[in-house]
Design a protein with these regions (language model features):
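A non-catalytic alpha/beta surface segment that caps or lines the substrate-entry region
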Residues: 16-54, 367
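N-terminal capping segment at the start of a domain
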Residues: 1-19, 184, 335
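A conserved active-site cap/scaffold subdomain adjacent to cofactor or substrate pockets
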Residues: 198, 222-279
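Zn-dependent metallopeptidase/amidohydrolase metal-coordination segment
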Residues: 60, 288, 292-299, 306, ...
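Acidic/histidine-rich catalytic neighborhood of metal-dependent amide-processing enzymes
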Residues: 93-167, 213-217, 276-282, 286, ...
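Alpha-helical metal-binding/catalytic segments enriched in His/Glu/Asp
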Residues: 58, 78-121, 172-180, 185-209, ...
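A short beta-alpha structural unit
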Residues: 8-13, 221-224, 230-232, 250-257, ...
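His/Asp/Glu-rich mid-to-C-terminal helical/loop segments that flank catalytic regions of hydrolases
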Residues: 13-16, 195-209, 262-272, 277, ...
């Protein structure tokens, strides 16, 4: 399956950050046509490719979360893993695309769906115009090679804004920088680790040292756990940093502080970021909320949050509770990009995949994931049997993202076996 790895390395040469996927769209469309597929592209940029009389559709998304120096992605191999130098790797979901490309070169009866802008609220699949010919859909966006996903979390974006003015003051100005945070990972898959949030740690540091905020921003993406944060703050007394917050004296002089200082700090410090409910039966997070980003610009304090739940009632509840929390502090709040969870069950496709997967991973099992999968939305648009698999990808959505090469080989074999059995 070396061609899968080569396919992936070639994909990494093409910029495909979310919202900036035009070059990748053109590449995949041309590739499919060259392999004899009939291709159509809808308004959202979703690419549908079909050849012969297929029974199964393979599906992956072609945008990536760009962190660090991405879209420049310099791939290298180290200790059996694919990594990227100073950037996210894009194995989520580039490896899935690479496997589909290999299958397109091999099979005469195949249907493929490449979806756009999955990483920004599953935008592409939510606007999907294509109707699939196949009755089974195999999604290749999972990140653990001993599991078959038949359920996933739904999600909703939440924004909270508060106007502020400034007050003139004079004194000592300190620059704060978050440091040593392991965050930046996927806010669904990695939220169970209970890693510290850079935004919350900085707010606590400022509050405990009686600081007055001049500026404060933190976080990277709505679906990444906050890793970075920085602030300019006035402290009356000399302040020293700690293991999480680097504190540097800048100067003494005049400045303007935020008149909503206490409300801003109280909002962050009182908010319960992270896991809210856990499913003991499936051993996965059931409901969570990610306090993702904070910005202060144009006299506006703006938070973005991402709520997830694997049950419909749980998602509606966390959305309601979060909005009421911010309203109580006087914020203007809105929610958008709501998509329901996929509360699936084992089916004929998952049974076929499990049989093939057990040959390479004897402990393979059927489960659900605390993250969004597009097949959950597609199966609500038309009647389909769905399942999701993928190779081991560690720390997606971060500069530490890495993908296990032998795991890619395993999943590639499984995909090819399932396709051959349904040729």
């Amino acid at each position: 399956m070396q061609n899968v790895i080569e396919n992936f390395k070639n994909l990494c040469k093409i910029p495909h950050c979310s919202y900036q996927t035009e070059q990748m769209k053109e590449f995949l469309s041309s590739y499919a046509k060259d392999k004899g597929f009939k291709v159509s592209i809808d308004k959202a940029g979703n690419i549908h490719a079909i050849k012969g009389n297929p029974k199964i559709c393979l599906q992956s998304h072609y945008d990536m979360v760009c962190m660090g120096e991405a879209p420049k992605v310099e791939v290298y191999e180290e200790n059996g893993f694919l990594r990227a130098k100073n950037s996210s790797l894009g194995a989520d979901n580039g490896i899935g695309i690479a496997i589909v490309m290999s299958a397109m070169a091999e099979f005469e009866n195949l249907e493929c769906l490449f979806t756009n802008d999955e990483e920004v609220g599953l935008m592409g699949v939510n606007s999907l115009e294509h109707t699939l010919s196949s009755k089974m859909l195999l999604n290749l966006d999972h990140e653990s090679d001993d599991e078959i996903m038949i359920g996933c979390a739904g999600g909703v974006d939440i924004e909270a804004e508060l106007s502020f003015s400034t007050l003139k003051a004079r004194g000592k100005i300190y620059e704060l920088q978050a440091q040593n945070f392991k965050g930046g990972g996927h806010s669904g898959i990695n939220i169970v680790r209970n890693e510290k949030s850079s935004i919350k740690e900085m707010a606590q540091f400022i509050k405990e040292n009686k600081g007055k905020i001049i500026s404060f921003e933190g976080g990277e993406r709505i679906n990444s756990i906050p890793k970075h944060a920085k602030a300019l703050v006035h402290f009356e007394n000399e302040v020293k940093g700690n293991g999480w917050i680097k504190c540097e004296f800048k100067k003494e002089g005049e400045f303007e502080i935020c008149d909503q200082n206490e409300k801003l700090l109280n909002t962050i410090n009182a908010f319960a970021h992270g896991v809210r409910a856990y499913d003991e039966h499936l051993s996965i997070v059931q409901t969570s909320i990610n306090l993702a980003t904070l910005k202060m610009e144009n006299q506006q304090i703006k938070f973005t949050l991402f709520a997830r739940s694997n049950i419909s009632d749980g998602l509606k509840q966390i959305e309601f509770e979060t909005m009421e929390f911010f309203k109580a502090f006087g914020y203007k709040v809105r929610s958008f990009n709501f998509y329901p969870p996929w509360e699936g069950k084992a089916n004929a496709l998952s049974d076929k995949v499990l049989k093939a997967l057990k040959k390479v991973s004897p402990k393979a099992r059927v489960s659900a994931i605390h993250a969004g999968l597009e097949c959950g939305i597609i199966e609500k648009k038309q009647e389909l049997l769905c399942a999701s698999i993928g190779p081991n990808i560690h720390n997606p959505h971060s500069t530490d993202e890495h993908c296990e090469i032998t795991s890619v080989e395993k999943i590639s074999r499984v995909v090819f076996e399932v396709l051959k059995d349904n040729a």
